[in-house]
Amino acid sequence: MKVALVVLALFGVSLAASIDNIEIPPSKNIYVEPINQPEVDPSLEIVNGQEVVPHSIPYQIFLVASAGETSWTCGGSLITKRYVLTAAHCIQGAKSVHVTLGAHNLAKHEASKVTVNGRSWVIHEKYDSTNIDNDIGVIQLERNLTLTRSIQLARLPSLRDVGINLEGRTATVSGWGLTNGIFQTTTDVLRANNTIISNKECNDVFKIVQPTEVCLSIAGGRSACSGDSGGPLVIDNVQHGIVSYGSSYCRSTPSVFTRVSSYLNWLQTHSEWRAQ
């Protein structure tokens, strides 16, 4: 199984957007080569996301991380007034992290938009970049945030949700990710709705899917794509997943998410969030 950690700038892709006139760095994504390569050109496959009503996903965050002269972007969610949930691969090796909240269009000035520095961040101690296991991390912000209509907390699973069967349920993934495999980005928050599939079906594609992960169907061509890494997967207003990996054939293979309910104890140890 071939795994590639990709920063889109390596392909010469320019993300023509900015946050308050500051150029947005490329996104950081994990691509896993499917066992059987789809018979489509990923550059032609547009992911059928829809623009959300502005600020209707108020826990959605946009992060920019840096290490030396290299910067990259990811998504995430606000889980307490001071902690952000994201994927481990989004903050691994970062020397600085900046989190933007209350945003809808990254390229426009919005009075609701707030950018806060990360004070510290931690990834799961058993994160495996080879098999993409335990792809979860948290960021402590430098200050507590004031909640507003545009900045709210994500609702995470309860202890009763541990081990529940999610197969067949409709889930929503959201973010500022690319609208196709490589070339087109968006400055507005998009969402895509689809159905959770079994890990067995997902493993027919990737062979590395674990019980601590959950997969989203690609029926109708709706899927998470490059740039959505770290963002939320929500079922009935509860965040059950974190965008982890997929293939560059966004519209032709499932997306894989870290299953949040598998890490409730870890989150309680490494953040202020408490399970109900």
Swiss-Prot record:
* Keyword field: Collagen degradation, Digestion, Disulfide bond, Glycoprotein, Hydrolase, Protease, Secreted, Serine protease, Signal, Zymogen
Q: Which family does it belong to?
A: Belongs to the peptidase S1 family.
Parts of the chain that traverse the membrane:
none
**Protein name, please?**
Chymotrypsin
- Name the species this protein comes from: Phaedon cochleariae
Q: In UniProt terms, what function does this protein have?
A: Serine protease with chymotryptic and collagenolytic activities.
- Every Peptidase S1 domain range: 46-272
Locations listed in the record: Secreted, Extracellular space
Keyword Glycoprotein in record = yes
